[in-house]
Design a protein with these regions (language model features):
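Class I (Rossmann-like) S-adenosyl-L-methionine-dependent methyltransferase catalytic domain
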Residues: 1-42, 59-67, 77-146
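Conserved acidic residues
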Residues: 45, 74
Length: 146
């Protein structure tokens, strides 16, 4: 099989290539591409999209899930910052203060919308986990076609 990896940032793609080389990955085993998600195309056994949806509001994120699912033959794995009422409240309070933004620009997403978008493309969730770090948490969902 083959592996394709992409990132919007050409610098991140170069860093990924460098690190892959340090890990013993031979040139050509992974194809690296600097691209936005909207431009990606092809067919893959598994499509993985991690820590990207913080840049997408709900509706565009759901559209992107459908786009990624259209490229996935069997598996789709995504992560996103889940919507919580407390975080929404804190973000709203931060927007009340004048001057440079005191609020995060990261979008939080409703899980039911992400699951519905994947379901519309023929995928069902088979595993869910919550990844927690001191100042960040994300929901990871693995989907299978069928």
């Amino acid at each position: 099989g083959s592996i394709a990896a992409s990132d919007l940032s050409a610098a991140m793609v170069q860093e990924a290539e460098r690190r892959a080389g340090e890990l013993g990955v031979k040139p050509g085993q992974i194809s690296f591409l600097a691209s936005d998600l909207e431009s990606l195309e092809g067919r893959y056994d598994t499509v993985i999209c991690l820590d990207v949806f913080i840049h997408y509001p709900q509706q565009p994120a759901e559209e992107m899930v459908r786009h990624l699912a259209a490229m996935a033959e069997r598996h789709l794995i995504v992560s996103f910052a889940p919507y919580t009422p407390l975080l929404a409240l804190l973000k709203g309070i931060g927007q009340l203060f004048p001057g440079p933004s005191k609020t995060t620009r990261a979008y939080t997403l409703r899980e039911d919308g992400i699951v519905a978008a994947a379901a519309a493309a023929g995928f069902k969730p088979v595993r869910r986990s919550l990844n927690q770090a001191p100042f960040y948490f994300s929901r990871l969902i693995a989907f299978e076609r069928g």
